[in-house]
Amino acid sequence: MKIDNLTKDIIQWMINYHHESKRESWIIGVSGGIDSAVATSLAVRTNIPTLGIVMPMSTSNHADVIFINRAFHLLNTIRQNYRITCQTIPIQPIIESYQKCGVGLSFIYNENNTFSSYRPIREGNLRSRIRANILYDIACEYCGLVVGTGNKDEDEIGYFTKGGDGLVDICPLSDLHKSTVYKLAEYLDVPQEIIQASPSAGLWDNQTDQQELGMSYDEIEWALDYDDTVTMQKYLGPYQQNVLLKVREMRRKNKHKLCYPPIFKLTREKGGLR
C-alpha cells in the first residue's frame, strides 16, 4: 500500500473510532521517539483536539533533556500547521515518593544491606506505569482517549510495560512494522533528529531498544514474518535461528500481555452449578 493512502486510511479510522466513542479529545504521551512522533502527527491530522503530554524524569538530567528537546522540536513543527495543546509534567518527584516506600528500586540489597544486583527494568516499568496514570488522569479531565504508540514489532513480542505504555485506548500503529513507521515519519515530516536517533524507550540512562533486545527491528520483522513452510529452519544460519528462537520465546513468555486475563467459568449441570 502507498504511504499516502495508508496515512489517509489510519486518520479516517481514528476519526471513525473517536466519533463512535463519544469522546472529545486525544491524549498522547510525547516522548521524543519516532513512534510517539508518528502517532502524534496522525492524531493532529484528525482535527480532533489533541493534548501532547511530555513527561521527563526531570528537566536537568542530560539524557532527559535530549528527549525533551526532540519532543518540543516535534511539537513546534506540528504547531506550524496543526493545533495541539502541550503540557510538561516531570515525574521524578512521583518516582521518589514510590521509592521511599521501597517500590520501583533499581538497586537491590541483601538482608545485611549489601549490594546484590542492579535491575533498571524495575524502575523503568515504574516510570512507564506512572506516565500511564498521568495520561489517564488527564483523559478523565478532558474526556479523551489515550493514543497508543506501540508498533507491530514491539507489540507482537510483548516489548512494552503491562499497565504502562501498553495501557491505551486506540492503537494506530500496532499492525505496522517499525520499517513502515519510519516511512510514515518521512511522509508526515517528522524532524530528522527524531528519525535518525537510535530507538529507545528512555526508561533508563543510555538505554537503546536494540541493546536491550539483543536484535534489531529489521531482524524482529523478519522473524515475525518468517514462514516455516517456505524455508525450513534447518536451512537457516545459526544467527538467524537464534533470532527466530528469541522472538518466538519472547512471544511465548509475554503471552499474558497480549490477551485478557483468563477467567474461571462456572459450568451448569442439571440445573445447578458445578
Model-derived segments and spans:
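Low-complexity, flexible helical/coil segments
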Residues: 63-66, 88-96, 130, 180-189, ...
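Short, structured secondary-structure boundary patches
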Residues: 48-50, 71-76, 108-111, 167-172, ...
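Alpha-helix boundary/capping residues
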Residues: 75, 101, 163, 188, ...
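Predominant activation on well-ordered alpha-helical scaffold segments within soluble catalytic domains
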Residues: 40, 69, 136, 179-182, ...
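ATP-dependent adenylation/nucleotidyltransferase module used to activate substrates
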Residues: 1-156
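Short, basic, helix/turn surface patches
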Residues: 76-86, 115, 120, 173-182, ...
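Catalytic subdomain that performs nucleotidyl-dependent activation
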Residues: 118-131, 144-216
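Peripheral terminal appendages
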Residues: 1-30, 34, 38-42, 46, ...
